[in-house]
Amino acid sequence: MKSRNGKRVMQWLNHFIEMAKLISTMSKDPSKKIGVVIVDQHNRIVSTGFNGFPRGVEDSSERLEDKDFKRAITLHAEENAILYAKQDLTGCDMYIYGLPPCSHCAAMIIQSGIKNIYYRIPDEYKISDHWKENLAIAETILNEVGINLLDM
């Protein structure tokens, strides 16, 4: 019975990671496309998000190619998913396709009450030293509060 339930759990995990991958394709970012699915305790989708400019802000190719401009205003997929959720996220799980959460998003995740984060990094994504340091901070604070961060 346990192996059957374990297989079913893996099916759900893979299902939601694949959904996050599909949602990541909505991002217009030319270098990194990140997608998020937030799911409640009953495997119901609560919210989704992808990285991009705030609504109403022109996302022309010129602006998307301007790294300083893009970094200054882009909302991360985790932020968008949390902002668009219309219910309490306490106890929910977050699935991320692209990169694990940065330190700022980790802080938002902590405040939202999400309990587990599952992520998958595409093989073609390279992580800079700056981001590695930031991701290490994120992992530290998530571990400190007992949020599971699991690489799929």
Regions found by a protein language model. Give the residues of each.
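Zinc-dependent deaminase catalytic domain
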Residues: 1-152
